[in-house]
């Protein structure tokens, strides 16, 4: 929007539409003026939306929203006839909806109204509004199936517009080229989108993420997935294919210079919102509808058809393109730490997005991990993941990023061929600067991962899983510096560790089992480890000397008082825990460890006495459970919210200032045009 007079007119029109009976002149101006994102965020104030939403003037807000939806559906329905004549009506409708929806989701009453409206039949809605629309000079002739709801109609039209010639893709683009960016499925686009097309793509990707953001205003136990369910259950296979290719390519793969440097902010917005949308869609492997909407409180599981289609991605070259692009982002923190290159802006930009996408690929795309065997930079990817996981493990602000890197690394080393590839020494790899966290890198990546993780303070289950996977899968190779892992094993075998929780006990068991498995299968190359164990065998007391009966007695005396035993006050939970620990001790392979501490090192007794108890190989993979999905969803939204509120690029945050319920929000300032001193003075003079 250009002149000050136009800004004043738009501000007055918005106030009139919210506070007075709808008038033709007001609506005509709202949907014909030239609006920008900053105009909408600056002149449709949060307090105005809330006042209207929470008063008897809510109907005005509801009418404005419904007209925006009708504009989008009707213009898309007859695009060739109405575009570009009604271009501003289409763009302004998306902009206004993007601004209004978070505040409607924020309130329980208005959120319920939106949900009811979305589920209502579209044709019926048009019929109900005809008298009012006639007064406003709005006439809609839309051809849609009678069964379409308002939300389905809106989503269908939005997705159609995402790949509409002349709006988001070039009018010269072939059917195969009607996606946003080159990458998977199509390596090159002969007629790439123009500057305006990119603007429209950015607008639509932002709107789709905002549409999904209703879960931001739900408690963690009562998440409403109605919008998401509608998105993933559309009968639109061709559209889904374009959505996957466009949003994946734009968010993670296409690194070409679309425009001049002055357009970097818009490019950044498009890239981020594209990556966020595809991540949010693919994150929900087991979608469950809001339970409190049903009388029995159980809800209904709905299949994610878009994810199912994504799982059918099968071309090796596509997987390798994705892996290469993700790894470029993941390498930024380590390169920055080593100061190999100079970064403009935040070097962590898109690292979380890439980690989350990689995590979803490794857990929900069956073929991706197998295809990484053909990825020449798999060792580099492991090193990057290790650095991110360890470097930011103690940083509360980056705990999600650290955990994602750990899960991804665990999944990579659950593949035996990738572990074997990681055993080859490659000193050309960029490694972390030597520090208390990272020793000098003079070995293979697989051994280096073990060295680093074994020296962490208070390792988590992720670290134990990673170490165990490597030890179970590593080929015959000497472990030169065994002190860190011996120290770690002696630590986890202390009663104060394994008695603290069953999870700790499980971590102790998996670490000891994998270590013994490694020794048995690499005995001749690792005699120095046997010698080290024997030298430090006192570190494994008292557990190494206990029989099963002695362990049971220890458990009882440590956890159950004598008076409780005498009076029969031990509850079933206590008895169950005792049985669990007794079985745990029985399966702990103490006899094998005891043998390692006493045997001669001049021959391999495990070969000569095959009847001795052996260790069963077990690989610990990441399973995308409901709990992990919920954790991921909450953290994705927390990251999106933080990025849009604090991002230096100036991307406006649609949710800024709203009362989010999904997680705790720290007070931050929005670095957008709203912080401009001149604009603040301008608003103060005109709108106070």
From Swiss-Prot:
Does the keyword field hold Heme?
Answer: no
What broad class describes the main subcellular location of this protein? Answer: cytoplasm
- Fetch the InterPro entries from UniProt: Hid-1/Ecm30 (IPR026705)
UniProt subcellular location: Cytoplasm; Nucleus
Q: Which residues cross the membrane?
A: none
Keywords per UniProt: Cytoplasm, Nucleus
**Cited Pfam families:** Hid1
This protein's GO CC annotations: cytosol; Golgi medial cisterna; Golgi trans cisterna; membrane; nucleus
Q: Does the keyword Signal apply?
A: no
The family note in this entry says: Belongs to the hid-1 family.
Protein known as: Hid-1 family protein P19A11.07c
